Curated annotation (Swiss-Prot):
Biased amino acid composition, Low complexity: 117-134
InterPro entries with a match to the protein in the record: 26S_Proteasome_ATPase, AAA+_ATPase, AAA_lid_3, ATPase_AAA_core, ATPase_AAA_CS, NA-bd_OB-fold, P-loop_NTPase, PRS7-like_OB
Underlying gene: RPT1
Record's protein name: 26S proteasome regulatory subunit 7 homolog
Predominant location category: cytoplasm
Length: 467
């Protein structure tokens, strides 16, 4: 290998075209060339779109500044955005109010809605001379209102500037000013939150087609509940009042609660579901108060359906055991029958009851006027059992050609709940065999396990003698 200093002699000679003159220098790009390179390959509207994006970012920054999105570390908006005068004015307009009850309305001519007036509280009058009202009637403009502040006193007061005389009625709850006790706000009736939570907000996903073996019962149920709500003119033409109460009774698992869920899905009326044991309270009078507030809330609705499940918890026949243990339950039942058909009209309220023991209910609760129709949910027949199998197997992966009538013949005197358990067990047999489809053999095994094997746990025959 030649020495390093002799490498030059071994290089190939350059041609004249490849030789670079020594005086060539690198020329820097001008501003125009840079702009050309930046815009090279850009679309015709790229500059306008870029300008629009910058304008949008500028507007967004100004909106965030005005709205106070970017706040300081202390959690407050910048000081230049403070509106101290507006805050003071807002605090001056809104004051905390006291809750009172309007017990009497005294007209401007000295008369009241009642035959007597309370003269003892006239010395506590604190009238408002600058009262403004939208009502043109002079009596309403000069009317005074007797309010009762709990554990304080009674006062005769006037209305605030933002309250109309037509908004105030005797017996309603009102919000009064703490200093002058003027009525500033009408309040809705007080209802226990536990009663309000009984309202069904979301409609169930059960329809009448999901209820098998209850064709006649569904027709009777719809005549009582749906027909008066959808076609009230039919009853008005005949001059009769539509039935307002219905009792669903039968052995457990025959579809009573399922039909009630289908009614809640079908109608647009407010649906209230009450479990009988919820009305049994510890303290005296609590259960009757809940029943009273329940019907008060139902009367505020345009149309309402109340469903009492397991009504035998509070609707049992009255008796004296000597110890008085069931006195509170009997008081609750008396309040219930009073609300159903007492001195005050029930209104457009339909009531449904469900029980497994109709023989234990009080005769006063079962009389016509309170419960107009009694529907028995008996055991399904052969056609009904086959229909129930088809309904429950609709969402299952089963093979074609299963003889549902044959399987139904193997399940005599079975309820809908037991037939659903048969479908579930058939799916379990398919899972044990690592199959994705349930076969007819799986259903036959399930019938042998559920209907024959669990027969000693069935209470259907015992409940049949009660219905």
């Amino acid at each position: 290998m030649p020495p390093k200093e002799d490498w030059e002699k071994y290089k190939a000679p350059l041609e004249d075209d490849d030789k670079k003159p020594d005086d060539d220098k690198i020329v820097p790009l001008t501003e125009g060339d840079i702009q050309v390179l930046k815009s090279y390959g850009a679309a015709p509207y790229a500059a306008k779109l870029k300008q629009t994006e910058n304008d949008l970012k500028d507007i967004e920054a100004r909106i965030k500044e005005k709205a106070g999105v970017k706040e300081s570390d202390t959690g407050l908006a910048p000081s230049h955005l403070w509106d101290i005068m507006g805050d003071r004015q807002r605090l001056g307009e809104e004051h905390p109010l006291q809750v009172a009850r309007c017990t009497k309305i005294i007209k401007g001519n000295g008369e009241s809605d009642e035959t007597t007036t309370d003269n003892n509280n006239s010395g506590n009058s604190n009238s408002n001379s600058n009262q403004q009202s939208t009502d043109a009637d002079e009596d309403d403009e000069d009317a005074k209102y007797v309010i009762n502040l709990k554990q304080i006193a009674k006062f005769v007061v006037g209305l605030g500037e933002r309250v109309s005389p037509t908004d105030i009625e005797e017996g309603m709850r009102v919000g009064v000013d703490r200093s002058k006790y003027n009525i500033e706000l009408p309040l809705p009736p007080r209802i226990d939150p536990s009663v309000t939570m009984m309202t069904v907000e979301e409609k169930p996903d059960v329809t009448y087609s999901d209820v098998g073996g209850c064709k006649d019962q569904i027709e009777k149920l719809r005549e009582v509940v749906e027909l008066p709500l959808l076609s009230p003119e039919r009853f008005a033409t005949l001059g009769i009042d539509p039935p307002k109460g219905i009792l669903l009774y039968g052995p457990p698992g025959t579809g009573k609660t399922l039909c009630a869920r289908a009614v809640a899905n079908r109608t647009d009326a407010t649906f209230i579901r009450v479990i009988g044991s919820e009305l049994v309270q510890k303290y005296v009078g609590e259960g009757a108060r809940m029943v009273r507030e329940l019907f008060e809330m139902a009367r505020t609705k345009k149309a309402c359906i109340i469903f009492f499940d397991e009504i035998d918890a509070v609707g049992g026949a009255r008796f004296d055991d000597g110890a008085g243990g069931d006195n509170e339950v009997q008081r609750t039942m008396l309040e219930l029958i009073t609300q159903l058909d007492g001195f005050d009209p029930r209104g457009n309220i339909k009531v449904m009851f469900a029980t497994n023991r109709p023989n234990t209910l009080d005769p006063a609760l079962l009389r016509p006027g309170r419960i107009d129709r009694k529907v028995e949910f008996s055991l399904p027949d052969l056609e009904g059992r086959a229909n129930i199998f088809r309904i429950h197997s609709k969402s299952m992966s089963v093979e074609r050609g299963i003889r549902w009538e044959l399987i139904s013949r193997l399940c005599p005197n079975s309820t809908g709940a037991e037939l659903r358990s048969v479908c579930t067990e058939a799916g379990m047999f398919a899972i044990r065999a690592r199959r994705k489809v349930a076969t007819e053999k799986d259903f036959l095994k399930a019938v042998d396990k559920v209907i024959s094997g669990y027969k000693k746990f069935s209470s259907t025959s015992r409940y049949m003698q009660y219905n």
